[in-house]
Amino acid sequence: MRPEIKQKIEQSRERKRENKRYSLYLYGSGITFATWGSGVRISSSPPVVSAGTFLYRTAQCREVEISMMIKDILAYGRPSVSFEVFPPRKDAPFEPVKSAVARLARQHPSFMSVTYGASGNSQANTVAIAAHVQELGVPALAHLTCLGATDESIASETLALRQAGVENILCLRGDLPKDSAEGQAGPFLHAVDLVRKLKPYGFCLGGACYPECHPDCAHLEDDIVHLREKVEAGLDFVTTQMFFDNNIFYRYLSKLRDRGVTVPIIAGIMPVANGRQISRICRLSGTYLPSRFKAIVDRYGDHPAAMLDAGVAYATEQIVDLFANGVNAVHIYTMNKPEVAERIMANLKGILGGDPVE
């Protein structure tokens, strides 16, 4: 990395550090709420899952530093629900995505992840949408892929994220752009190479894992070895690929813990609103479709309204079961559909209320 780029990253980190102190104001009955530079989160009883809002007794403090890093949010120990969005494709309008993001932010997720466009379609748009998420007071998790990248391109993109206030990066291998010639994979052949590259620069780093084994890996045990390498290189948390059978996840989680993977594991849940789409996704990814859920898709897959109802109900049931069994972090693949997130969060309202915060 060129010294001047490294210096810019460090300067941006220092500015961010200086701006991470948020004022607290009295808001009735001895409850305080947090404000930050991009706006104000005001609520007499904000949801516990809201990452940007913490309650304090006024006698305890008047000012507090609130972390937007996912590792700190997960360490809080409360049930956590996060959403995933994808940026507009190259030259596509921003407004529909920004509108969806704004609606999702009103559900007070713990964070929102923003995917990384392939083949140059939306890499710059990832930064723009992540910045918009941050402006709404929600921590952003920016996806970053490394296959085909160079030291310079990684430095440039991480600097852009840092300047946008993004502190969380999901480190992924990704795929080579279709127009790349053979041998242009670059110095970052695996996600672990990206983790090692980024670890010194103070980002909170996440990774991906596959309860049913990565499609390119022959054996689950080998896949777990690769995951452990990424964790040892510096991952702070891991998010799973979607699954539709919680028992598969529980067995996988047990294997990870037995093999020394101790970082938080976020369970990835996809509410299915399109029967034909999910059949294709499962074929490509090798995700197991339980007979109980397959019957739902077969029965309602050609009826969008019914499939939406059934998909939301099934995803809600999965999440409730996960929370009941001690899995406190769930990531919902919302596919830019705020209406899906709204319905699920309404179903979980009582569960996410939790105990009063002291």
Regions flagged by a language model, labelled:
Residues I70, P93-F94, G120-A131, T150-S156, ...:
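Active-site-adjacent beta->alpha loops and helix N-cap segments on the catalytic face
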Residues E84, M112, L161, K230, ...:
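Conserved, mostly hydrophobic/aromatic
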Residues V85-P88, T115-S119, H143-A149, G174-D175, ...:
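Active-site beta-loop-alpha junctions enriched in small/polar residues
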Residues M1-K16, Y22-S43:
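Short, positively charged low-complexity motifs
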Residues D91-L104, T126, E152-T158, H219-E229, ...:
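Short, acidic/polar
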Residues S80-P96, A140-E152, G206-D222, Y300-A313:
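Active-site mouth loops of central-metabolism enzymes
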Residues A185-Y210, G260-V312, E317, L348-E358:
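Active-site pocket-lining/capping segments in soluble small-molecule metabolic enzymes
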Residues E65-F83, K90, P356-E358:
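N-terminal amphipathic alpha-helix/helix-capping segment at the start of soluble metabolic enzymes
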